[in-house]
């Protein structure tokens, strides 16, 4: 047999086809031919060598590839056939033409190497193969598999299997297969048990490597292996060693050349050689494998029988005897391994099971349920986990082959494969490095702390000796300490150390070496790691003296037992609960971790998937409004009937009512058809708004018991009806059937109260709330009318539900909270996304107006912020003024949009704003109901008002927190929606009990009981035992107790009796507060009581009375109760005291009545308790009285009678009605309730008396203690502070109080002194010292001790008295330092903006627009050189050439200083940048081009906002308005505010008379009038002439004369006001006359225009005054040379100059150069004609000169400086056409001819301090003179409105009352806002006015 055959057979055992042939074959094949190739038949004829004949179409490469295809098995089939023919004649190997080589002489004969037990039989079988070829031989069972496999391979060899880590059993069979014809060989094998680890080896790789090694090397390695494993291999003959067992057979864990693991070799039960272990099991393994093989082997054997028909030998054997028929061999019994008693036969033996049924222990363990489901029998037979056994072969042979191949691979490849030992943990860690061989080596190193205590003492720098080490480790040196009884080293796990646990690893469930048996948990009581029981008592401490806690606990243990027996305290279940519960030993699944947690809200029972309608999910407009005003919020969920403007119902008259029965049936049929068409089943029909109508489907009515529920659904949202049912214990009949809803069986209640067994409660449930509902029968007379625009529809109603109190499941956000703001933002974003989806344009686009219309309360900036995320604003092109969707932005899908905002979030937000509106209507400000911070929430809850506490954001948060266990609810209180105790109050209270804060008497200061008779430590044992006998404790129990146990029982029982108010020895009571457990229990009981009460009341079908008389009587009772409560609050008396006083008063009154009447016959009509005799019922209504006699029983048991007399007719009627209509039971309950109330009062009285008694005793004890100390002087109650006003000198208010008469005066010098007065110092001394009771001065002998507080207060008074306060008006104007020109951080930080700035100030708005334009110019590319001023050090000659430098930073600072009242001045300075660049750099320079682009951008921005800027400029300068009415109203308003209101003591006429203070004023005065009303009329332009204005002014005087009389001081003040008004009007007579004339002319022109417009539609629009009316040839225009301001045609002007000649002149005059140059070039300017109004407003020459010289005095108060433009048009068209040519318009500082003291407008400071004046003012009516660049001052300044002072509170009130004003705007600088002496009138412009 040659090596080639070995290679072939090894390939059949699982090798790769590429190495089937020998080296010679490989060489020939590589040459191109290869062996006999059967594949050549596919492409033509082949020659004798098996190659294609002739020149075929295939080249050499294709032929090679074709030869390679022979690996599919065709070539091997022919090779085997030919080989069989040649082998039939001879045993030796033959040389084949195809390259099969002959065996070498020195080849090892593998056929002799065999297993020990089968050597003879195999050799016999081999030699007798030719004679006995039949299968059924004597020993045929052993090789049944191998023979059939071999024959099967001869007929049709299988294709080679793919390489893999595991091979099938059939391939493994081929390795050791033996052919009976002699061609099969047996590879050498070593007997060893199978190892699961060997199966992991890659068979293909090992076989490949072995084939590549060559047969000679393989044989050598095998012989070397044999020498290592066979016994005496080097001494005995080779054949003799084969007959002896090998080392691996005796010791399966032996590895040649490896480290011996003695625990594995000689472990427990493993030290006996396993020689006999496989002696009897060999045949059985084969038999088991045959049984498991089944049908496959039978088919193979049938094929073998057909082939071997000539073999006629048959052997008949008797069946093997049963095991019980044979005697067991003692040696086998002794040497056999100990089998597990729990294991069962898995088919590996032939013995018959015992007839007795045997129950496997694991069968009825914790997995019994699963075994029952799988049908496993009791004995557990046949249970295999679904695993499959592998087909058993000679495992030792396979394992030997695998090891041999691995070694060959390792030797050839040079790669060292990791041995098994390398994977042990001991080889993974470098534990050798941690061994301390010498203590000196680690002396200077620190040992590892976790190992130091186990290693013991080692000398180091820290622990030089053992004592120091013990101290460091915390050990004590005493030997008496208890040592631990266990080893300090961890305990070894014997199963891990000695057991073969790795055999139980499942490597392949389909290829198991044996079937695993279910393990049984066994607890070893000797296992030190197991704690099998809990110790009963706590272990004593290790110290010699027990601790105080342990002593106390042991001593109090008996007293607790006694108190539990007597029933004083309950047995404490929490101690038992604290112990761990005994777990089921079979419950190994950690079920406690899967139980539902109680932290969250109680989950909804059953499925709670709420599917809203499509319109609701998409938040469509009618159902989910984007904005709700105050009216809609007040009508929230209570919509009024809508009045239709069109449709059938818009017309009056009778309308028919349509029935809906047919429509309902028709709609139901249509929906059923639709459902059937879609395939049946459930279907969702609420898809469109039309589906939400009430005209079809089933309807129910639900009436909510709460007036304003915390949460309400919107239209289209779904709600489920759940029927909660709690089963009865034992046999339960099931839940009753309900018409609506789904039944849910609940064990724990989803409500605050629990359900009773057998109780069913229906509930509304959705994502917002859960609320119980109660079905009521609808009266048959009721029906439903549906009103639409088309008509009326009627339908029936069957059922109505009453909805109980809601249990919120969704938290309502607080106002202005983060959640609310986030919802507003997301809601707006969702609306924008839906608008884009609706857009049909491409790209999609929307308008800002659509969003502003839907969200009017949102500012444009917030909307723009949302839009910028997804869209761009287009200013030009096709999409101009549209927001176009960004190209790179993906619109969210519908599902994503729905996820952003849910309908529940909208409902919560609506509930919040509706409640907010209700609170505002009730008078609460916004700050009062802000949501509190979380950490201070409990304190905040105690401080807020009751109405705010009932707001939904507070109640829902409280309920949800209570459900999570974070707090408790108040249950009864202000948040009860019913108001009568039938609902829950959702207000947070802490979990721990707190002292009740009722309106009781103030409790006295609790003093310590130490040293008093209430001190339990002073109570003798004898007295204590006597107290116990009084308490009823048995004598035998008392004897068992020690002293402190007796004291404990006394204290506990006294406390219990003191709580109930009955304890005679309550002085020994301690800790009257409830424990947490009692508090929780009372809370649950109270919740259950209210829950049951609510169910009873709301489910009641009793019809309530609606009698008006009874309700009025009840109202009167409520009023009386309210008065009683007020009295209680004022007097701080208890209700018992009040009732006693009231009874005493009634008794005395009755006595007086009896004495007055003189009749004593009323004593005959006696009735017992609560019975009455009614007298004089038939008397007249005026003289009726009711006498009620009541019999009482006092504390001693004596009876006495009291008589009550009632004279109120309503009370008499109510009493008689109750007596006549109600039965005795009702009256008894009513009286019983009253009796219960009295009983509570009685208990309260006892408690208070006991406290008073205790106080008296304590006071007496204090008197007896020592000499009476001097009592502190009793301080009188501090009266109200008598503050003296600093302005008027009156007492009772301060100068900042608006009740001060001089509060509104501004021109009068302040009368408050600079320093503090003596009276103020005295008042301050009283206020500084807070604690009046503390003795501040003590006299001890000759020493006087001053209190620390007294010294501190004196220092504080002295410090405050030294402060001098100067009014700002009296201070000289400060010169502010000019800010440097280089502000480095200008573009890094935004400027600080005051939070108090006026929002509606047009100057601020204009400045913000201009600043945004500056930002846009700054963002242009390459504009950096113009951002900041030019550095003079870098560019030294710049300021020599440029005299007026300008840059963007300076421009920004000017804007922030409000220096630009118009865009023309702003543009002029920007144009100055361009001119400077052209002057210095040249007109063609790149920097000049960049500056020109900045100017172009500015012009573009100004043109975009042309209309808005024009309106702002008009608002800044009202006198320049086109309308003369505005100027007229402006002058009148200044007369009122600065002249009439400045009259001393005129404050009573400033505002309307308060009706509360003067109740009869409006009865006397029919037409009231005041200065504020006049100002309102002025702002509304109601006065178009002075006559109408004077009529109202005179009406003030007439009203004062009428009400106060002509001699009253008020009348004199009113007369002075009228005189001032007449005087001022006379001064402005000429100007006002011209304005009246112009207003009248404009009116007439408007009327004429209206008439002409009706005739001729082409008539031009507004009236244009004619030149003769406007011009006066005698006037002249004075020109200021420096006032060169560039203005465009859109500048505001007082007059219009439509003359074409004037425009031409102005255009020529303006020029396009610098202002100064233009003046020099043109010389004199032709003066245009001025109007009469212009002439009136011209200043005198002297004043003009003063203005030009800049020499205004501080006392100068010019009326105003009007900015006039000579441009003739305000139209946008003309301004656009004239934009390139900027006309030069001259501005004049004009003022009316008035005296200085009569002026209405004043400068703030002189001309030199112009920058301060500009900062302080928003209004500029004067010209702006360019400052000298070298100076810090300006020639002129803008004036601001001075005079009339108004407080901020009054401004707010005025704005709320009268709305915004149009007169003036003043912005206070920060300095002036901080000053309390400067106030300015500030109204709003007509831009924001609604009027």
Curated annotation (Swiss-Prot):
Cellular compartments annotated: Nucleus
Listed Basic and acidic residues bias regions: 995-1004, 1139-1148, 1254-1270
Annotated organism of origin: Mus musculus
Region (Histone acetyltransferase (HAT)): 538-997
Chain residue ranges for the region called Disordered: 1-34, 154-180, 197-224, 535-556, 990-1009, 1128-1148, 1254-1278, 1651-1676, 1690-1891
GO CC annotation: MLL1 complex; nucleus; pronucleus; transcription factor TFIID complex
Key words of the record: Acetylation, Acyltransferase, ATP-binding, Bromodomain, Cell cycle, DNA-binding, Isopeptide bond, Kinase, Nucleotide-binding, Nucleus, Phosphoprotein, Repeat, Serine/threonine-protein kinase, Transcription, Transcription regulation, Transferase, Ubl conjugation
Protein modification: Phosphorylated by casein kinase II in vitro.
GO MF annotation terms: ATP binding; DNA binding; histone acetyltransferase activity; promoter-specific chromatin binding; protein serine kinase activity; protein serine/threonine kinase activity; RNA polymerase II general transcription initiation factor activity; TBP-class protein binding
Keyword Nucleus: yes
EC number: 2.3.1.48, 2.7.11.1
Modified residues (Phosphoserine): 328, 1690, 1693, 1799, 1802, 1820, 1847
InterPro entries: Bromodomain, Bromodomain-like_sf, Bromodomain_CS, TAF1, TAF1_animal, TAF1_HAT_dom, TAF_II_230-bd, TAFII-230_TBP-bd_sf
Cross-link Glycyl lysine isopeptide (Lys-Gly) (interchain with G-Cter in SUMO2): where in chain: 570, 583
Oligomer status and interactors: Component of the TFIID basal transcription factor complex, composed of TATA-box-binding protein TBP, and a number of TBP-associated factors (TAFs). TFIID consists of at least TBP, TAF1, TAF2, TAF3, TAF4, TAF5, TAF6, TAF7, TAF8, TAF9, TAF10, TAF11, TAF12 and TAF13. Interacts with TAF7; the interaction is direct. TAF1, when part of the TFIID complex, interacts with C-terminus of TP53.
DNA-binding positions: 1216-1294
Name listed for the protein in its UniProt record: Transcription initiation factor TFIID subunit 1
